[in-house]
């Protein structure tokens, strides 16, 4: 029986709808399954304070504390991505470290980032993508080594680091000045870096104007969320405490709740960058996570 023109159009339209739905489902499925190939965790410094209450106001005044500091090298099919660059490699040449905050903090770099990249068989020029949780010097201390990489940064953070008063936010321009000429992707919120759901930048403002965290999907390890300085150690996270050195308290609390919900929905591990006890359990090069 021959279909009428209207009937044929309806059939074609229905087929198109099915095709769109199938394509959408296929894309969603690919996004759910996509993972990075591996991720290295580097020791990018440590900082010792004589008073941890600077980071947990009113709690444990006068108690000494050691903060870990990690960088993460991610291997994706499209290339290498570095998340945070830690303290400056120059500190590794200082036997007594570098003193900051009027003597309240001593920063040390046991190994250079460059030497740890080499253990993974990677040079700084091999890194195609770079992103920082924020631009305080313990996270962006080696930023100038990655001038060939595409920079992923929240627009609010970009405006702050290259604006007229970067020191107001605790930024030190000399540590990242060379990034001015990098190819840059300015973000206004969450962003799927590779378009497949394997690496997602999560906007978490508060600690700085454009602070961000990172969700990484690994085949065996599962989903990991890298905190940046959303929180500094487990007890602060559990109590939702905000350090005194912080840009916007309300934004930080809101960002904490956002990530806490994401941890639940993604069944994710939450890795707190400066939590020494947690960091001590992480594999180091040449070992990696996959």
Regions found by a protein language model. Give the residues of each.
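Short, electropositive alpha-helical surface patch
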Residues: 132, 137-143, 210, 280-290
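Bacterial N-terminal signal peptides that target proteins for export
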Residues: 1-13
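Metallo-beta-lactamase
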Residues: 18-20, 24-126, 154-203, 221-228, 251-267, ...
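Cap/insert and terminal regions of metallo-dependent hydrolase folds
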Residues: 89, 101-115, 213-215, 220-290
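Active-site metal-binding loops of divalent metal-dependent hydrolases
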Residues: 44-45, 85-88, 135, 156, ...
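Short Gly/Pro-enriched turn/cap motifs at secondary-structure boundaries
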Residues: 61-65, 202-207
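Active-site metal-binding motif and surrounding structural segment of the metallo-beta-lactamase
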Residues: 93-153
């Amino acid at each position: 029986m021959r279909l009428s023109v209207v009937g044929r159009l309806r059939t074609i339209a229905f087929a198109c709808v099915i095709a769109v739905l199938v394509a959408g489902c296929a894309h969603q499925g690919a996004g759910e399954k996509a993972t990075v190939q591996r991720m290295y965790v580097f020791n990018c410094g440590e900082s010792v304070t004589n008073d941890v209450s600077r980071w947990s106001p009113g709690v444990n005044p006068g108690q000494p504390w050691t903060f870990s500091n990690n960088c993460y090298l991610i291997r994706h099919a499209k290339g290498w991505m570095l998340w945070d660059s830690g303290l400056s490699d120059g500190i590794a040449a200082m036997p007594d470290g570098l003193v900051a905050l009027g003597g309240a903090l001593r920063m040390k770099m046991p190994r250079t980032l460059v030497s740890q990249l080499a253990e993974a068989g990677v040079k700084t020029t091999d890194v195609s993508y770079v992103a920082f949780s924020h631009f305080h010097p313990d996270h962006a201390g080696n930023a100038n080594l990655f001038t060939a990489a595409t920079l992923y940064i929240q627009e609010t953070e970009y405006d702050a680091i290259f604006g007229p008063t970067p020191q107001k936010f605790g930024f030190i321009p000399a540590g990242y000045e060379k990034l001015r000429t990098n190819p840059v992707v300015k973000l206004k919120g969450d962003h799927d870096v590779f378009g497949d759901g394997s690496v997602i930048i999560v906007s978490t403002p508060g600690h700085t104007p454009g602070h961000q965290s990172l969700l990484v999907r690994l085949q065996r390890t599962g989903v990991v969320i890298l905190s940046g300085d959303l929180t500094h150690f487990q007890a602060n996270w559990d109590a939702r405490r905000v350090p005194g050195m912080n840009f916007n308290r309300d934004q930080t609390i809101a960002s904490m709740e956002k990530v806490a919900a994401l941890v639940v929905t993604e069944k994710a591990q939450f890795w707190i960058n400066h939590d020494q006890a947690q960091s001590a359990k992480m594999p180091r090069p040449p070992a990696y996570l996959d």
